[in-house]
Amino acid sequence: MSSTRPLSGLTVIEIGHSVAAPYAGMILGELGAEVIKVENPKGGDPCRGWGPPFTEGTATAFHAFNRAKRGVTIDLADPAQVDSLRRLICRRADVLIHNLKYGTLDRYGLSAERLTTEKPSLVWCNVGAFGSTGPLRDRPGYDPMMQAYGGLMSLLGEDGRPPVRVGVSIIDIATGMWSVIAVLAALQERQRTGRGGVVDTSLYETTLGWMTLPISAYLANGEIPRRHGSGIEQIVPYQAFETADGHMMVAAGSDNLFRRLCGAIGRPGLAEEPRFCTNADRVVNRRELVPILSDIFRTAPITVWAERLDAAGIPNSPIQTLDQVVTDPQTAALGIIQQWAGSPALSLVGLPLSFDGARPAFAKTAPRLGEDNAETVDRSL
């Protein structure tokens, strides 16, 4: 590819807040689209205040989710400003993406039906909470709610202890990614037909997507899975073990890997025992096998086990903390942590992709509230 900005020439209007829609907008912007973020003039996106840490008075979280964008303010309670936004969309936008509560844009005359009628080439992307239909359609939603309601939290934590949530906004971020996938598919279809259309994604649907394996298993056998801490229901051993100086992850995901694991830890006979021969046997006899392995791993430090397991080709990893992750030689080699040398000085995680070996560079810092009003909105008046 000749460019790391393949979406150059596209214009995206993002009426987004918090994480999901802004993350989608950030991806599109880093890939070259002109993304115009629309905020309420009375404080803007609440994410601006999600700190500490703050950089020049704005939360680092806002910079992470809103780089590569221009910024304007529109008061949706002001008909004149709404009309200005509508003209901006109709004149310039290829894509509109929003995550306001269901029906909000309809009330202000910015419905999908109206805008796609006025501009048939527009791709109108709704990033919802529970989806665009059903009894929960009108409910608001945040990432923790979806981890709970969609069953993800029922799988996390130790058996017999309270459920826990994934500590990052995995549902929000993944919904942003699905939104980008859907938008790009709609734009590809527009290449053939000349028409845009309406794209719907939601936090709840994303959660169900993450739950593909456990839901499929339940539909097959009717059994509700138990919580296994760092492990999973279908594979054993596939979890973290305590060593003499910390925890490490061990993933013997096949019968062959299990046999090699047993040799590496000095217990080759374990793999020959009928109760542990196949993965299905090990799943049934998890409570017998895991304590045996746990006792063995406690006898030596992580470095010793890592050397033995690496030599045997067994996937394994220490449980790294963030200070270790950001200074890890592999992280450095990938160049995924990018610096902005201007003002404000920032270091953020870049897009996790490359084109012909080149990663899209840090395009632009997040906009100040309304910083592009004069150039962008006022021209539509």
Report each predicted region and the residues it spans.
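Glycine-rich beta-alpha junction loops
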Residues: 42, 130-131, 203-208, 245-247, ...
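Terminal low-complexity tails and localization/encapsulation signals of metabolic enzymes
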Residues: 1-11, 226, 242, 322-381
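Short, well-structured beta-strand/strand-turn elements
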Residues: 35, 310-324
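Aromatic-enriched alpha-helical interface/lid elements that frame and gate functional surfaces
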Residues: 236-312, 316
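N-terminal helix-loop segment corresponding to the beta1-alpha1 unit
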Residues: 1-182, 186-195, 339-340, 364, ...
